[in-house]
Amino acid sequence: MTTQTSTGLRHQTVLLDEAVDALIWRDDGIYIDGTFGRGGHSRRILERLGPGGRLVAFDKDPAAITEAGTVEDARFAIEHDSFAQMARCLDARGVEQVAGVLLDLGISSPQIDEGARGFSFRMDGPLDMRMDTTRGITAAQWLAEADERDIARVIRDYGEERFAVQIAKAIVARRGQSGDRGPLDRTSELAALVAQAVKTREKGQDPATRTFQALRIHVNQELADLETGLKAAFDRLEQGGRLVVISFHSLEDRIVKRFMQALARPEQSAAPELRRAPLRAHELPAPQLRLLGRVKPSEAEVSANPRARSAIMRVAERC
């Protein structure tokens, strides 16, 4: 589904039918869309729900909240918050259990394509990178104040960038210059600085890709939110409820895979203890999730939407 947003920007929802097919197992349940984005998944979920079904969506982005205002359906509600706050928000609505939770972790095309948001190294704009532009510090503010070692750590750990130390040194050195060469505050400035600091290029990838990813993850606390959100989602799932997660890079997918496998195969996480005390095997907790598989976009989808190439969808069911 290609969504035309209220601002005229277009967004192609990744793994639309696959995600909704995996999520909906009864049409009268309460479902969660953890990232409304531009509404592709939410609108398809509402199409599949019966009169007794309900959908609660979350998003940190004010633009997404505005877009959600165009959904005229009494079964739908939107929360301007991170899905990491799912438990608190559902408590406020009196919702104890849900039939399914969908987390689409990708950044939306309108966010990337709007230069003023600061997510893209391909166009000039303020170095912002906040999903929620109403709160928190921008990437520019953090880079102007952070310690060189912290900058290197973030770029290395969240961007898996092997030139993280060199990039951090260049960023800090830039802060000490005066005039137009002062602290970074434009995406084009950061992209140019990284291009100079990175000594070798990966085929088909801009040298700034990993650094921009790392800063976006850090500014928005994406991995911490993911870990909190996964636990909150599992805690709310009713028996038979589905957890569907679409990730777009290895850091996200690693967290999702580890979380699901720990609940589906408790004997693996307990293996070291069992080797020391094998008679305790009968004390192992029963599996709490059933793994239903992993799905990647088809060649046809990737051809139509190259941004879908890195997507991986994992599905699990509450036992």
UniProtKB/Swiss-Prot annotation:
One of its GO terms (molecular function) is rRNA (cytosine-N4-)-methyltransferase activity. It catalyses: cytidine(1402) in 16S rRNA + S-adenosyl-L-methionine = N(4)-methylcytidine(1402) in 16S rRNA + S-adenosyl-L-homocysteine + H(+). It comes from the Bacteria. S-adenosyl-L-methionine binds at G39, G40, H41, D59, F83, D104, Q111. One of its GO terms (cellular component) is cytoplasm. It is an enzyme of class 2 (transferase). Its EC number is 2.1.1.199. It is found in: Cytoplasm. Its main location: cytoplasm. InterPro entries: RsmH, SAM-dep_MeTrfase_MraW_recog, SAM-dependent_MTases_sf. Keywords: Cytoplasm, Methyltransferase, rRNA processing, S-adenosyl-L-methionine, Transferase. GO terms for biological process: rRNA base methylation. Specifically methylates the N4 position of cytidine in position 1402 (C1402) of 16S rRNA. Belongs to the methyltransferase superfamily. RsmH family. This is Ribosomal RNA small subunit methyltransferase H. It comes from Ralstonia pickettii (strain 12J).
